[in-house]
Amino acid sequence: MKFCKKYEEYMQGQKEKKNLPGVGFKKLKKILKRCRRNHVPSRISFTDAINHNCSRECPVCDGTFFPELLKEMEDVVGWFNEHAQKLLELHLASGFTKCLTWLRGNSRKKDHHGLIQEGKDLVNYALINAVAIRKILKKYDKIHESRQGQAFKTQVQKMRIEILQSPWLCELMAFHINLKESKKESGATITSPPPPVHALFDGCALTFDDGKPLLSCELSDSVKVDIDLTCSICLDTVFDPISLTCGHIYCYMCACSAASVNVVDGLKTAEATEKCPLCREDGVYKGAVHLDELNILLKRSCRDYWEERRKTERAERLQQAKEYWDYQCRSFTGI
């Protein structure tokens, strides 16, 4: 089955259960077909591609294809982030909050299996839309003999509406593993329903390649998502992980150091000019997200390392806190 038909059937099945946004795959392909008939082949510079300044013979770039795709991507990422955050907040909530949810009659979320299935559905939704976007941009480049699709993807990443960059995708993958592991530890039998016919996502795994941790999941469409869990600052497994708005993951204390802030003040006080150590993008610290599910997963999977790192970080945080309050005291007394 061709991906377009597979995607349309998947989205149709989802919309019967809940009204959720998607990529207008068929509509965008029709735009490209018209472009194929009218397009005069010509090479377009990479700079022009970023600015979307195509030749006039190409009706696709004349305020049609990219604006339409951009709006759909914003809707997809916005819906995914909102629902993923709600699900994760429910899982990490106190017993009282969970009790209120149960009393309100949200039967799907109140049981263990319901949480697993909803998390799996959200990851599947994110991945199948990511594949749809990748394929339609690849088709665009093929028809135009250009790199505009790749340039658009780069621009979207800078705008932070690339779904694979979402910290909530990483959190959902860790959440999925955590729930399955806790089910095993409790000794309960895991009875999962067969995967949907058109599902791409078949589960996640935390793997170690030469001691380096990777959070990964396989797609049936020959695409693999790997999230490197090695902090590029301390070159060790991320501890108390945090995701910057550019999508890169660091230890919380390493991120504070890179942003030139004290752990007492936190990343919210970072200057807008401070840049990500990897991509050098600025303004990425204030919207950083704590990866609590990933923190739980790594704590469970790397017990010895976690305990050793916890002791080291505790001593360092206490030292930083002491220096911070000593400085505040001296400033107040004028000494």
UniProtKB/Swiss-Prot annotation:
High expression in roots and stems, medium in seedlings, flowers, rosette and cauline leaves, and very low in siliques. Detected in cotyledons, hypocotyls, pedicel, receptacle, pistil, sepal, filament of stamen and at the two ends of developing siliques. A zinc finger (RING-type) spans 231-280. Pathway: Protein modification; protein ubiquitination. Changing E74K: In bah1-4; loss of activity. InterPro entries: BAH1 (IPR033326), SPX_dom (IPR004331), Znf_C3HC4_RING-type (IPR018957), Znf_RING (IPR001841), Znf_RING/FYVE/PHD (IPR013083), Znf_RING_CS (IPR017907). GO terms for biological process: defense response to bacterium; plant-type hypersensitive response; protein ubiquitination; regulation of salicylic acid metabolic process; response to benzoic acid; response to nitrate; response to salicylic acid; salicylic acid biosynthetic process. It catalyses: S-ubiquitinyl-[E2 ubiquitin-conjugating enzyme]-L-cysteine + [acceptor protein]-L-lysine = [E2 ubiquitin-conjugating enzyme]-L-cysteine + N(6)-ubiquitinyl-[acceptor protein]-L-lysine. Gene3D superfamilies: Zinc/RING finger domain, C3HC4 (zinc finger) (3.30.40.10). Changing E162K: In bah1-7; loss of activity. The keyword Cell cycle does not apply. Its EC number is 2.3.2.27. Induction: Induced by salicylic acid and benzoic acid. GO terms for molecular function: ubiquitin-protein transferase activity; zinc ion binding. Residues 1-154 form the SPX domain. Keywords: Cell membrane, Membrane, Metal-binding, Nucleus, Transferase, Ubl conjugation pathway, Zinc, Zinc-finger. E3 ubiquitin-protein ligase that mediates E2-dependent protein ubiquitination. Plays a role in salicylic acid-mediated negative feedback regulation of salicylic acid (SA) accumulation. May be involved in the overall regulation of SA, benzoic acid and phenylpropanoid biosynthesis. Involved in defense response. May act as negative regulator of resistance to the necrotrophic fungal pathogen Plectosphaerella cucumerina by modulating the accumulation of the phytoalexin camalexin and the salicylic acid- and jasmonate- dependent defense pathways. The RING-type zinc finger domain mediates binding to an E2 ubiquitin-conjugating enzyme. Interacts with UBC8. Interacts with PHT1-1 and PHT1-4. Forms homodimers (via RING domain). Interacts with UBC24/PHO2. Interacts with NPF2.13/NRT1.7. Interacts with NAC92/ORE1. Is the target of miR827, a Pi starvation-induced microRNA. This is E3 ubiquitin-protein ligase NLA. The lineage of its organism: Eukaryota, Viridiplantae, Streptophyta, Embryophyta, Tracheophyta. The gene is NLA.
